[in-house]
Design a protein with these regions (language model features):
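Low-complexity, intrinsically disordered Gly/Pro/Thr-rich segments
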Residues: 73-77
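Short S/T/G/P-rich N-terminal loop/turn motif that feeds into the first structured element of a domain
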Residues: 1-50, 55-69, 83-97
């Protein structure tokens, strides 16, 4: 199991806008991805930063998904609220409690 951890700074006061886009887009976006498990959307309101932690069965599945047109299109909808480029890390989950 892998955690794909995406962190990005947002333009001021846009966390709720991005959260609503995520709620609207993500269910259909990952519906056909059999290796996708779950996601957590978290925010640091003081610093206008969001972190998304997505659980995938394999790192390769996420990497292929991230190349898809559907993924790129979704990221385009979010990008208008970004202050910069997202940071993406793929980490193996060693303990899950």
């Amino acid at each position: 199991m892998y955690a794909v951890i995406t962190t990005v700074g947002l333009k001021p006061d846009r966390i709720d806008d991005v959260r609503e886009i995520f709620r609207r887009i993500n269910p259909d976006l990952v519906a056909g991805q059999e290796d996708w498990e779950s996601a957590v959307f978290a925010a640091d309101r003081k610093n206008d930063t969001i972190t998304l932690i997505a659980r995938w069965k394999s790192a390769e599945s996420y990497q292929e998904f991230a190349k898809s047109e559907e993924y790129r299109s979704a990221m385009g909808e979010f990008a208008r609220y970004f202050r910069g480029s997202p940071s993406v890390e793929i980490n193996e989950i060693l303990v899950d409690m």
